[in-house]
UniProtKB/Swiss-Prot annotation:
Gene name, Swiss-Prot/TrEMBL: murI
GO molecular function: glutamate racemase activity
Keyword set, alphabetical order: Cell shape, Cell wall biogenesis/degradation, Isomerase, Peptidoglycan synthesis
Stated name of the protein: Glutamate racemase
Claim: DNA damage is one of the keywords in the record: no
Family to which this protein belongs: Belongs to the aspartate/glutamate racemases family.
GO biological process: cell wall organization; peptidoglycan biosynthetic process; regulation of cell shape
Pathway annotation: Cell wall biogenesis; peptidoglycan biosynthesis
Length: 268
């Protein structure tokens, strides 16, 4: 087994990536670090986002001697990867919206990207569309409200379908046939989204591709960090003083045995 993987997100959206990684690496140690004190990232100034993310990720990666870092956040991935690669010598995996497979899959040649406002406005996103969706009509939809709906669901609350329907109405009206979920929070409410959009709209995310990339990189670059540890270690660290009982329960159900605030974590 390899040394621990550090998975980072602004909130619980990265758990959609964690779930896919666990399917292919069920015995792998993981540390899930979520910066819920600054949620949602899609509305932060770029300089603030970059500085905070790089500091948090580097601090924790060094503490746990991580084999690999997954930035399981689209908003952060568009900005922080260069800074991380300057400071860390381990592989860094970011999340890229699934524009390329969506363009190949769309029969109508009409796709949508649903992401946070920050991801929607970045030049990186426009470059992806220009490179991989040539010949397709691409519509962009930004929403921070869906991030909070996903957070609420994982904390044990029912999804507010009225709010969700209002957020998705422009997509329903667009008549597209393929929708890219460009935020790792969104797969958490994918079943509710499918219910509203109907089966005529295919939903795509990057979770499986990220998990496959992680496996490849661990085998390719991390052989020097193989450890002998028969006890799985799944740790979740948050940046607020506390989290809800509902979220604590959901994290425990996913196998996390240590769930602590960054201020009280003793992982060094």
């Amino acid at each position: 087994m390899f040394g621990p993987i550090l998975i980072f997100d602004s909130g619980i959206g990265g758990l959609s990536i964690f779930d896919e990684i666990r399917k292919v690496l069920p015995d792998q140690d993981c540390c899930y670090l979520f910066d819920n004190a600054r949620l949602p990232y899609g509305e932060l100034e770029e300089s603030v986002l970059i500085k905070g993310c790089v500091e948090l990720i580097c601090e924790q990666a060094l503490k746990i001697d991580a084999s690999l870092v997954v930035v399981a956040c689209n908003s952060a991935s568009t900005l922080v990867l260069p800074g991380l690669r300057e400071r860390l010598s381990i592989p860094i995996v970011g999340v890229v919206p699934a524009i390329k497979p969506a363009a190949k899959l769309s029969i109508a040649r009409h796709i949508g990207l649903l992401a946070t406002p920050g991801t929607i406005k970045r030049s990186y996103t426009r470059e992806l569309i220009e490179q991989f969706a040539d010949g397709c009509k691409v519509e962009l939809f930004g929403s921070s409200e869906l991030v909070m709906l996903a957070e609420a669901k994982l904390a044990g609350e029912s999804v507010d379908l009225i709010k969700l329907r209002a957020q998705l109405e422009p997509i329903r009206q667009s008549k597209l046939d393929t929708l890219v979920l460009g935020c790792t929070h969104f797969p958490i409410i994918a079943s509710e989204m499918q219910q509203i959009l109907g089966n005529g709209v295919k939903l795509l995310d990057s979770g499986v591709a990220i998990a496959q990339r992680v496996v490849f990189l661990l085998n390719e670059f991390s052989l020097d960090k193989v450890v002998d540890n028969r006890t799985k270690n799944l740790t979740a660290i948050y940046t607020t003083a506390e989290i809800s009982a509902g979220l604590t329960t959901r994290l425990a159900e996913k196998g996390f045995t240590k769930i602590v605030s960054r201020s009280s974590a003793n992982l060094g």
